From Swiss-Prot:
GO terms for cellular component: cytosolic large ribosomal subunit. It comes from Rickettsia canadensis (strain McKiel). One of its GO terms (biological process) is translation. Belongs to the bacterial ribosomal protein bL25 family. CTC subfamily. This is Large ribosomal subunit protein bL25. The lineage of its organism: Bacteria, Pseudomonadati, Pseudomonadota, Alphaproteobacteria, Rickettsiales. One of its GO terms (molecular function) is structural constituent of ribosome. The keyword rRNA-binding applies. The gene is rplY. InterPro entries: Rbsml_bL25/Gln-tRNA_synth_N, Ribosomal_bL25/Gln-tRNA_synth, Ribosomal_bL25_b-dom, Ribosomal_bL25_C, Ribosomal_bL25_long, Ribosomal_bL25_short, Ribosomal_L25_dom, Ribosomal_uL5_bac-type. Keywords: Ribonucleoprotein, Ribosomal protein, RNA-binding, rRNA-binding. This is one of the proteins that binds to the 5S RNA in the ribosome where it forms part of the central protuberance. Pfam families: Ribosomal_L25p (PF01386), Ribosomal_TL5_C (PF14693). Part of the 50S ribosomal subunit; part of the 5S rRNA/L5/L18/L25 subcomplex. Contacts the 5S rRNA. Binds to the 5S rRNA independently of L5 and L18. Disulfide bonds: none annotated.
Amino acid sequence: MSKILELEAQSRTEFGTGAARALRREGRVPAIIYGAGKTPVSISLEEKEITKYYRKPAFISQLINLTIDKKQYKVLPKAVELHPVTDIVRHVDFVFLEEKKQKMEVPVVYEGKERALGVKRGGYFNIVKRRVTLLCDVNNIPRNVTIDVTNMPIATSLNSSKIVLPKGCSFASKKEFVLATIIGRRGVKTEAEGEQQAAAEAGK
């Protein structure tokens, strides 16, 4: 599960392009928190601090304890605007955490894809989903979904129904979907095709 990140912010009452530029000259980044039926809160963050954390893996699924004027809020990053040249953070949207379940998008890590059975037989590992949307308990938010695909054979699909998710999480979509496939390259027979050919030759 994600370790909770502690951040401090300041509330802001001035808005617009001019106010945002003034904040950035002071080394701060404008931001906003919204969602969960609550009144939006406009804040500013220290530029160096938020840029440092943004550059770490899985920031967008990072649970954050945000302290604003001595009050604490549990939030998640929703969207980040970057400078087009320097990649310094220019604006951040956060969302308030829901009381029970939080819908969020997390990356998928396919462990062992280079040495999967189907790849060893000449197949190509095709990633269909690099990120998935989950419903998670607010106290059990994963950084990612890790799937061991070492034993995945050639010409097969990895479906959502086969995935064991972290405790307290479920897929947001109730419909089954494909996360990855191993595609057979031309000239490479799948196990089923090999068995069919062997049976045909035996019957001659």
